[in-house]
Protein backbone atom coordinates (compact mmCIF):
# COMPACT_ATOMS: atom_id res chain seq x y z
CA UNK A 1 0.00 0.00 0.00
CA UNK A 2 2.91 2.37 0.53
CA UNK A 3 5.08 3.63 -2.25
CA UNK A 4 8.65 2.49 -1.82
CA UNK A 5 11.12 5.13 -2.81
CA UNK A 6 14.62 4.20 -3.75
CA UNK A 7 17.33 6.21 -2.11
CA UNK A 8 19.04 8.44 -4.60
CA UNK A 9 22.68 7.64 -5.07
CA UNK A 10 24.75 10.34 -3.48
CA UNK A 11 26.42 12.64 -5.96
CA UNK A 12 30.16 12.47 -5.86
CA UNK A 13 31.94 15.70 -5.15
CA UNK A 14 33.28 17.55 -8.16
CA UNK A 15 36.91 18.64 -7.94
CA UNK A 16 38.19 22.12 -8.77
CA UNK A 17 39.99 20.70 -11.82
CA UNK A 18 36.74 19.13 -13.08
CA UNK A 19 34.88 22.42 -12.62
CA UNK A 20 37.55 24.31 -14.55
CA UNK A 21 37.68 21.70 -17.33
CA UNK A 22 33.89 21.86 -17.74
CA UNK A 23 33.88 25.66 -17.68
CA UNK A 24 36.70 25.87 -20.26
CA UNK A 25 34.81 23.45 -22.55
CA UNK A 26 31.75 25.72 -22.43
CA UNK A 27 29.59 23.34 -20.41
CA UNK A 28 26.83 25.70 -19.18
CA UNK A 29 25.62 23.21 -16.58
CA UNK A 30 29.08 23.10 -15.03
CA UNK A 31 29.32 26.90 -15.26
CA UNK A 32 25.97 27.26 -13.48
CA UNK A 33 27.05 24.82 -10.77
CA UNK A 34 30.32 26.72 -10.32
CA UNK A 35 28.42 30.01 -9.94
CA UNK A 36 26.18 28.37 -7.34
CA UNK A 37 29.28 27.08 -5.54
CA UNK A 38 30.86 30.55 -5.53
CA UNK A 39 27.62 32.15 -4.27
CA UNK A 40 27.26 29.57 -1.49
CA UNK A 41 27.90 30.78 2.03
CA UNK A 42 28.60 27.29 3.37
CA UNK A 43 32.12 27.14 4.80
CA UNK A 44 32.80 23.77 3.15
CA UNK A 45 32.11 25.31 -0.28
CA UNK A 46 34.29 28.38 0.15
CA UNK A 47 37.73 26.76 -0.17
CA UNK A 48 36.68 24.79 -3.27
CA UNK A 49 35.12 27.94 -4.77
CA UNK A 50 38.33 29.88 -4.14
CA UNK A 51 40.38 27.15 -5.81
CA UNK A 52 38.08 27.17 -8.87
CA UNK A 53 38.37 30.97 -9.14
CA UNK A 54 42.17 30.85 -8.86
CA UNK A 55 42.42 28.18 -11.57
CA UNK A 56 40.15 30.25 -13.87
CA UNK A 57 42.10 33.52 -13.47
CA UNK A 58 44.61 32.81 -16.29
CA UNK A 59 41.68 32.67 -18.74
CA UNK A 60 40.19 36.07 -17.86
CA UNK A 61 40.45 39.67 -18.98
CA UNK A 62 39.47 39.25 -22.61
CA UNK A 63 35.84 40.31 -22.44
CA UNK A 64 33.93 43.53 -22.87
CA UNK A 65 32.11 44.18 -19.60
CA UNK A 66 29.09 46.47 -19.65
CA UNK A 67 27.17 47.54 -16.57
CA UNK A 68 23.53 48.40 -17.19
CA UNK A 69 21.45 50.35 -14.69
CA UNK A 70 18.31 52.44 -14.55
CA UNK A 71 15.22 52.98 -12.45
CA UNK A 72 12.96 49.96 -11.98
CA UNK A 73 10.69 49.65 -15.02
CA UNK A 74 12.95 51.66 -17.34
CA UNK A 75 13.43 48.65 -19.63
CA UNK A 76 16.85 47.32 -18.59
CA UNK A 77 15.97 43.66 -19.25
CA UNK A 78 14.13 44.45 -22.47
CA UNK A 79 17.09 46.50 -23.71
CA UNK A 80 19.48 43.69 -22.81
CA UNK A 81 17.31 41.30 -24.84
CA UNK A 82 17.73 43.54 -27.92
CA UNK A 83 21.42 44.45 -27.35
CA UNK A 84 22.24 40.82 -26.61
CA UNK A 85 20.78 39.57 -29.89
CA UNK A 86 22.86 42.20 -31.70
CA UNK A 87 26.02 40.91 -29.96
CA UNK A 88 25.18 37.30 -30.87
CA UNK A 89 24.40 38.22 -34.49
CA UNK A 90 27.93 39.64 -34.76
CA UNK A 91 29.39 36.28 -33.68
CA UNK A 92 30.02 36.96 -30.00
CA UNK A 93 29.15 35.00 -26.90
CA UNK A 94 27.22 36.78 -24.16
CA UNK A 95 26.83 36.25 -20.42
CA UNK A 96 24.18 38.30 -18.65
CA UNK A 97 24.44 38.60 -14.88
CA UNK A 98 21.04 39.93 -13.81
CA UNK A 99 21.00 41.11 -10.21
CA UNK A 100 17.53 41.18 -8.67
CA UNK A 101 16.53 43.01 -5.50
CA UNK A 102 16.01 40.80 -2.47
CA UNK A 103 13.50 40.95 0.33
CA UNK A 104 15.03 42.43 3.46
CA UNK A 105 13.02 39.95 5.51
CA UNK A 106 13.70 36.66 3.71
CA UNK A 107 16.70 37.65 1.53
CA UNK A 108 14.79 35.88 -1.25
CA UNK A 109 14.28 37.22 -4.75
CA UNK A 110 11.82 36.65 -7.58
CA UNK A 111 14.65 36.38 -10.13
CA UNK A 112 12.28 37.53 -12.88
CA UNK A 113 14.72 39.39 -15.14
CA UNK A 114 15.42 36.27 -17.20
CA UNK A 115 11.74 35.97 -18.14
CA UNK A 116 11.89 39.44 -19.72
CA UNK A 117 14.74 38.34 -22.00
CA UNK A 118 12.55 36.01 -24.05
CA UNK A 119 14.54 35.94 -27.28
CA UNK A 120 17.98 35.98 -25.69
CA UNK A 121 17.21 33.23 -23.18
CA UNK A 122 16.82 30.61 -25.93
CA UNK A 123 20.08 31.39 -27.75
CA UNK A 124 22.86 28.81 -27.47
CA UNK A 125 25.65 31.39 -27.15
CA UNK A 126 23.90 33.29 -24.35
CA UNK A 127 24.20 32.48 -20.65
CA UNK A 128 21.77 34.33 -18.38
CA UNK A 129 22.30 34.04 -14.66
CA UNK A 130 19.88 35.77 -12.31
CA UNK A 131 21.27 36.31 -8.81
CA UNK A 132 19.68 37.87 -5.73
CA UNK A 133 21.36 40.97 -4.33
CA UNK A 134 20.81 39.43 -0.86
CA UNK A 135 21.16 42.83 0.77
CA UNK A 136 24.48 43.66 -0.88
CA UNK A 137 24.94 47.34 -1.62
CA UNK A 138 26.31 48.68 -4.87
CA UNK A 139 23.61 47.25 -7.13
CA UNK A 140 25.31 43.88 -7.52
CA UNK A 141 25.33 40.51 -5.77
CA UNK A 142 27.97 39.57 -3.23
CA UNK A 143 29.94 37.43 -5.71
CA UNK A 144 29.39 39.25 -9.01
CA UNK A 145 33.11 39.85 -9.56
CA UNK A 146 33.86 36.13 -9.13
CA UNK A 147 30.99 35.20 -11.45
CA UNK A 148 32.51 37.46 -14.12
CA UNK A 149 35.79 35.50 -13.77
CA UNK A 150 33.94 32.21 -14.33
CA UNK A 151 32.10 33.56 -17.39
CA UNK A 152 35.30 34.88 -18.94
CA UNK A 153 37.01 31.53 -18.37
CA UNK A 154 34.05 29.89 -20.14
CA UNK A 155 34.79 31.98 -23.23
CA UNK A 156 32.10 34.65 -22.97
CA UNK A 157 33.62 37.66 -24.70
CA UNK A 158 30.77 40.02 -23.74
CA UNK A 159 29.40 40.31 -20.22
CA UNK A 160 26.42 42.44 -19.27
CA UNK A 161 25.85 43.13 -15.57
CA UNK A 162 22.31 44.33 -14.94
CA UNK A 163 22.06 46.07 -11.57
CA UNK A 164 19.05 46.06 -9.24
CA UNK A 165 18.12 49.60 -10.28
CA UNK A 166 19.54 53.07 -10.09
CA UNK A 167 20.14 54.65 -6.74
CA UNK A 168 22.87 56.08 -4.59
CA UNK A 169 24.24 52.61 -3.88
CA UNK A 170 24.88 51.69 -7.55
CA UNK A 171 28.63 52.22 -7.33
CA UNK A 172 30.19 48.77 -6.90
CA UNK A 173 29.44 47.68 -10.46
CA UNK A 174 31.31 50.70 -11.84
CA UNK A 175 34.67 49.19 -10.81
CA UNK A 176 33.81 45.84 -12.44
CA UNK A 177 32.94 47.03 -15.94
CA UNK A 178 34.51 48.80 -18.92
CA UNK A 179 31.39 50.77 -19.81
CA UNK A 180 28.40 51.88 -17.76
CA UNK A 181 25.02 52.36 -19.45
CA UNK A 182 22.16 54.26 -17.80
CA UNK A 183 18.69 53.45 -19.15
CA UNK A 184 16.19 56.26 -18.51
CA UNK A 185 12.43 56.54 -18.98
Predicted segment positions?
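Charged, compositionally biased N-terminal leader segments and the immediate start
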Residues: 1-20
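Residues at the beta-strand->loop junction immediately N-terminal to the Walker
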Residues: 69
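Nucleotide-state-sensitive switch-loop elements of NTP-binding domains
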Residues: 15-66, 74, 79-169, 174-185
Amino acid sequence: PYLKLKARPRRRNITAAEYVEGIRKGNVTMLGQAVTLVESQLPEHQSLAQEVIEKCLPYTGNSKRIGITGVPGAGKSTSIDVFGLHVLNRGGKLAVLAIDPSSELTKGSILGDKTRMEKLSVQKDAFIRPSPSAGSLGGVARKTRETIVLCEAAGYDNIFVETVGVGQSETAVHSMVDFFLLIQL
